[in-house]
């Protein structure tokens, strides 16, 4: 509902003032403000659990606020659904895209509001209007193409174009670059800036600090459900924003590299995957206590390396030698028995059972070892080991019966790492271990990884964040199109050198 009363000064497109929201026993929002100007890109920042999602759900009417006012284009609003918000000019591009993969691009653009000619859908008009919007936003996608054939970045372009078709004045973007290549990110930024030029106010949510400084004009920081500050980006530093988010100064983004790697524990020679296109002739050593990074552009086949080592992919050639003895991991069980562990890239889809508790999620990789002599599960040992995961990984939770899906991304990741440590691995492989995790939790994950290396674990980390690889690893193996293009020492290499190597075999 849009009220005709309470005009604003006209300086802001959206004004959320003094927003309060409580749930039983929890004050989720405490006097929170968010004010977005036209022709601006406004970062909304805070750790997971800071209140960002709750605030936006109050805006879209998914939650009803307890008190406070929301003005949009000078009029007080009180929406009761996301559909109502969209029809009135407020749109959101979610991290989990909301498109029908089996339908065409233009069907998705106009779903529920098809242009008609008599009793039938006017396909020609739908095509023309879709094409006109795409041309205006410089989007090169065939309106008739099935959405299921497109890349993630192209799907995001469609979501943005759909918002544009509703004449949205406020567009909220939630972690829009989490699965994009650098080239796709740059194209996305071009489109976002075009929306800004046309008078839109963009609310941009991201944990990637570099993007915030590259793209945004202002930032609002929330912490523990409270509004901390709204300031122009031009007057801030990365350290200042981090301090506002976590409530303390983080003197360093990465732990000190105090550990000295020991003898070689893993030798990989000419590793080639059976399924093609994939990795070819990959060779490297991993030392005891070493953190080895794997870098490369999207499509470089970084993940294929750890999946082949873990027995998910079958190798067609090459050798894997552990402590001087050649081994073959034909499946994940063999890999686990040989001391390998893999924390996968997609935490939500392949890492956790979101609706089950921390106890189940902590023990699932090792559940057979909890059977007693008569074949029953030893509940006492299971509870003890779950508590070990919670304590040693410093998981913030009310208890082991808590549903893991209710935890922050950082705490979910700690449970997954703890789960694998219960298998007592020698080689721990982590694929994008801090994706979607806030800055404070990232540092905690880095500390855990550094501590594991100090205890002699051999660690392999795949990451798309170059500062992360340079900050926590000892060496970086650079992949390009399935081939190793170089192995560099992080003490002496540069980001530009890694990018040069990553482009070598394209």
Curated annotation (Swiss-Prot):
SMART domains in alphabetical order: AAA (SM00382)
Catalytic activity: D-galactose(out) + ATP + H2O = D-galactose(in) + ADP + phosphate + H(+); methyl beta-D-galactoside(out) + ATP + H2O = methyl beta-D-galactoside(in) + ADP + phosphate + H(+)
Keywords: ATP-binding, Cell inner membrane, Cell membrane, Membrane, Nucleotide-binding, Repeat, Sugar transport, Translocase, Transport
Membrane topology, record value: Peripheral membrane protein
Localization annotation: Cell inner membrane
GO molecular function terms listed in the Swiss-Prot or TrEMBL record: ATP binding; ATP hydrolysis activity
Keyword Transport in annotation: yes
Primary location group: membrane
Binding site for ATP: 46-53
Disulfide bonds, paired cysteine numbers: none
SUPFAM superfamilies in the record: P-loop containing nucleoside triphosphate hydrolases (SSF52540)
One GO cellular component term: plasma membrane
Gene3D superfamilies recorded: P-loop containing nucleotide triphosphate hydrolases
EC number: 7.5.2.11
Domain ABC transporter: 14-249, 264-506
Classification via NCBIfam families: PRK10982.1 (NF008215)
Family listed: Belongs to the ABC transporter superfamily. Galactose/methyl galactoside importer (TC 3.A.1.2.3) family.
Quaternary structure note: The complex is composed of one ATP-binding protein (MglA), two transmembrane proteins (MglC) and a solute-binding protein (MglB).
Role, per record: Part of the ABC transporter complex MglABC involved in galactose/methyl galactoside import. Responsible for energy coupling to the transport system.
Entry protein name: Galactose/methyl galactoside import ATP-binding protein MglA
Naturally occurring in which organism (per UniProt): Escherichia coli (strain UTI89 / UPEC)
